[in-house]
Each structure stands twice: as structure tokens, then as C-alpha cells.
Amino acid sequence: MVNPRLVHLKKRGDFLRVASARRKFVTPSLILQARPHDKSEAGETAPIRVGFTVSRRVGNAVVRNRVRRRLRAAAEAILPEFAAKNSDFVIIGRPAARDKKYASLTGHLKSALVQYEKQNKNQKLIAE
């Protein structure tokens, strides 16, 4: 079931905009790239937008799709609670993700989100 608060990134340009923000948080099983967006990009509701990618280094197509499904399930469980509402995220599966348990994947995603929130808070304080 698709979470109504999450919108999936599908276009290459969206992925490139998130990567160009240079906010990257690395964990053993995934890399989280993040970028805040403004309401002019996403509309008034400002949903959480997320994209998933898994490279061929992770395994063949069957393995990559399994990793992508597990990352998608973890994101749908974690992002609505812990993520900033006006953000775009790209979750990149790493080779270690194929052997990790679901609880480990969600823990890694939470830790990456905590790092992102800390960095966002620090940048807001510096801007003031």
C-alpha cells in the first residue's frame, strides 16, 4: 500500500537535484541523500518525496529489486515519523543491504535521518 504522505521521485532531474545539494549520510547498508525543497516546487501540501536506487554492484536484477522493495518498506515506515516534511530524499542501496535484516535497515535509515536533522538545525542556527 502506498503511503499518501510519500511521493516517489521518478525523473532523472529530480534525482540530480537531490544529489547536487551535497547532503549525503552514509550508513553500512544505505546512503541517504537529502535536499530541502520549497513550496513552489511541491505545492502547498509539501509532501515527503523519496526516490530509490540500487546499483548493479549489489547483485543481479532479482537481488536489486528485493533490496529496493525492502528499502521502500523501511522508508514508508520511518520517513513519515522522522523526516522533515519539506524534503526530498534519495535512498541508495549498498551491497551490505542484501544481507541485513529489516530491523537493521530501519535503524540505519533512522540514524541517517537523525544526522540530516542535526545538520539542518545547525545550518538554521548559522543562518540566523
What does each of the following model-derived ranges do?
Residues 1-128:
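Positively charged, solvent-exposed patches that mediate nucleic-acid binding
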